[in-house]
Structure formats: C-alpha cells, structure tokens
Amino acid sequence: MATSPMLFLVSLLLVLVAAATGDEASPSNAAAPAAPVLVGGRTEIRDVGSNKAVQSLGRFAVAEHNRRLRHGGSGGPADPVPVKLAFARVVEAQKQVVSGVAYYLKVAASARDPRGGAAAGGDRVFDAVVVVKAWLKSKELVSFTPASSTK
C-alpha cells in the first residue's frame, strides 16, 4: 500500500509541529523572551549613542542626502529636505529584517551654511531609512524626511 508510508509521514510531521509549537506556548518555558517579538517586525536598537555602526549609518544617510542635493535631487518625494546638512548624531534607531536589514534612524543634523560649516539654529531631527545588504556590500538611503513632532 502506497498510502501507508504517506500517512505515516504526515502524522510524523503533525507530531513534530505540535511538539515545536506546544513547547513555546508553555508557561513553564523559562527561556521565553520578556516581550513578544514579531517576526519581520521592527526591534529597538539600544545604546545608539555608543553604537559605532549605527552612528556610521546616520553619517552615511546625511552624506547621501547631501550628494543627492548636489546632483539635483532636492524636493523630490524621496528626499524633500532642500538644504545641505551637517551630521550631529543618531538619537534613536530600529532595525527590521527584510531583503537585507532596514534601519529606521532618527538623525540629528543642522543646516550647513554655504561655506560648509554648521549654520546657527541648532540641530533638527530627520527620519532616515537605510537598507544594508551585507552580502552585496551595499547600503542604500531609501528615504530622508523631517521627523514628525509627535512620537
């Protein structure tokens, strides 16, 4: 009978799936995370001030924004900030695994005066999205917009 081995394999698969999901749902599982993690969801990056990789991505986002301005990219929907900026720091960051890793950064930067230095007026906060594909050794600025005043 050809159906007997197939029935056995399906039954075995169901038992394995039930065992795998039943263990995670058990309240006695001591290794369970404190907060639920959504697969494919965003996760906070802690200690962004001392995280050199995150600060480097913020610096890249501002440099890429300025490069696009030099090449006529101002005012477009993907880059609506019409002034060159001087990077200050990343103040907040999240990451999300997509086709690569998407970093959602809150970047503090100030407007640059025409001589290249930071202009008076202090830092403003911008939302930047950078996608890193390590296996291709690439990173791309997807968007760079003024941050909304509400969190």
Curated annotation (Swiss-Prot):
Listed GO biological process terms: defense response
Cross-referenced InterPro entries: Cystatin_dom, Cystatin_sf
Keywords: Plant defense, Protease inhibitor, Secreted, Signal, Thiol protease inhibitor
SUPFAM superfamilies on file: Cystatin/monellin
UniProt main location, coarse: secreted
GO molecular function: cysteine-type endopeptidase inhibitor activity
First and last residue of the signal peptide: 1-22
Domain Cystatin span(s) in chain numbering: 40-109
Any single Gene Ontology cellular-component annotation: extracellular region
Superkingdom assignment: Eukaryota
Keyword match S-adenosyl-L-methionine: no
Site (Reactive site): G40
Subcellular locations according to the entry: Secreted
Location of the motif Secondary area of contact: 96-100
Family to which the UniProt record says this protein belongs: Belongs to the cystatin family. Phytocystatin subfamily.
Protein task: Specific inhibitor of cysteine proteinases. Probably involved in the regulation of endogenous processes and in defense against pests and pathogens.
Protein name, entry field: Cysteine proteinase inhibitor 10
Organism whose genome encodes this protein: Oryza sativa subsp. indica (Rice)
UniProt lineage: Eukaryota, Viridiplantae, Streptophyta, Embryophyta, Tracheophyta
